[in-house]
């Protein structure tokens, strides 16, 4: 890398990718599938208990930027590795390692760590460490909070072991560690509302949200009870048909724009086309995938936002199989997927008919 290179992705031979702890092997399998399809010579190293995968160039050549991967919360090119910072002057040693790579300005400084119980203690350390680091950066002439500048990532495996990277402006999820800070409104019927709120904020672009979630639009919520997803759609002004044999929250039962049908979500057929199908049913993922495809190819909905509950093993293979089921394997239907922070043993998927106008 040339001195003070602001675009490290051109030279990166290693990427650090973050995921939900316990899903590192699944992210590695997804990386292997991408690298094989793209002809990229690389190999992953998994830190499964930390929720981290390092992807290394196999031949020393720069790696291309990975696409938006389902299991990756965050991804950035590595510029420096500090395996043992000194106890007394961690800031000085870190800046010395970063010196050849620091640009004149940074959009932000993100101190990250494993999303685990042990990582919580590191989080407290990072909050104390951050102001000292930012002050030292300013003293070296690096402007902070500059829009459009690269973002500095520092991954702390512990208080002295750090991996540093620079991410281009606008890349990755717009939150440290890929974790949005969402609060559950008191009026929400269940915590599942946070899942849909995060999905809408990440899987749709701002332009798509404005165009596709307008007051007066229509949606069907399969497996709606107690109504967390229906509630989020109502906050956007959509009219919702909530399909579930279980009860809805009282506030939704009193809402004239919500129609509750006590029916089986797999048997329900809409009387007319709706703008959205949403589904968070606890069911076999392949069965849900076939149901969503049927809705889309039948023209019953323009877009679908749904969860797939994953098996304990071979989860990436399950995702790939479900994608092929939904899209037909030929790009006939659009697909965008992510394991969100509020997902657990599941992923969230946005699928659409091309005429619905989502980006590919």
UniProtKB/Swiss-Prot annotation:
InterPro entries: RlmM_FDX, RlmM_THUMP-like, RNA_MeTrfase_FtsJ_dom, rRNA_MeTrfase_M, SAM-dependent_MTases_sf. GO terms for biological process: methylation; rRNA processing. Gene3D superfamilies: 3.30.2300.20, 3.30.70.2810, Vaccinia Virus protein VP39. The active site is at 309 (proton acceptor). Keywords: Cytoplasm, Methyltransferase, rRNA processing, S-adenosyl-L-methionine, Transferase. Catalyzes the 2'-O-methylation at nucleotide C2498 in 23S rRNA. This is Ribosomal RNA large subunit methyltransferase M.
């Amino acid at each position: 890398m040339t001195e003070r290179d602001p675009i490290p992705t051109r030279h990166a031979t290693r990427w650090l990718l973050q995921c939900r702890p316990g899903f590192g092997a699944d992210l590695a399998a997804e990386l292997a599938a991408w690298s094989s399809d793209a002809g990229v010579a690389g190999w992953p190293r998994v830190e499964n208990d930390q929720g981290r995968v390092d992807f290394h160039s196999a031949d020393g050549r720069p790696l291309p930027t990975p696409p938006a991967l389902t299991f990756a919360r965050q991804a950035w090119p590595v510029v420096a590795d500090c395996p043992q910072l000194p106890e007394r002057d961690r800031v000085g040693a870190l800046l010395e390692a970063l010196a050849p790579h620091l640009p004149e300005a940074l959009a932000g400084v993100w101190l990250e760590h494993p999303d685990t119980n042990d990582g919580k203690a590191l989080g407290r350390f990072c909050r104390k460490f951050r102001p000292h680091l930012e002050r030292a950066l300013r003293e070296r002439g690096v402007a902070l909070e500059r829009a459009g500048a690269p973002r500095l990532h520092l991954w702390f495996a512990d208080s002295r072991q750090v991996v540093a990277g620079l991410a281009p402006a606008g890349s990755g999820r717009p939150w440290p560690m890929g974790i949005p800070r969402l609060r559950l409104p008191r009026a929400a019927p269940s915590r599942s509302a946070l899942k849909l709120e995060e999905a809408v904020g990440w899987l749709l672009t701002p332009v798509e949200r404005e165009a596709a979630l307008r007051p007066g639009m229509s949606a069907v919520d399969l497996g709606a009870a107690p109504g967390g997803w229906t509630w989020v759609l109502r906050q956007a002004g959509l009219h919702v048909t909530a399909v579930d044999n279980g009860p809805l929250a009282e506030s939704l039962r009193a809402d004239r724009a919500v129609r509750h049908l006590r029916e089986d979500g797999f048997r329900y057929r809409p009387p007319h086309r709706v703008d959205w199908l949403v589904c968070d049913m606890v069911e076999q993922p392949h069965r849900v995938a076939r149901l969503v495809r049927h809705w889309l190819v039948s023209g019953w909905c323009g877009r679908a936002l749904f969860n797939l509950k994953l098996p304990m093993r071979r989860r990436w293979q399950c995702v790939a199989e479900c994608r092929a089921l939904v899209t037909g394997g030929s790009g006939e239907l659009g697909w965008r997927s992510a394991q969100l922070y509020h997902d657990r043993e599941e992923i969230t998927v946005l699928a659409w008919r091309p005429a619905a106008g989502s980006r590919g």
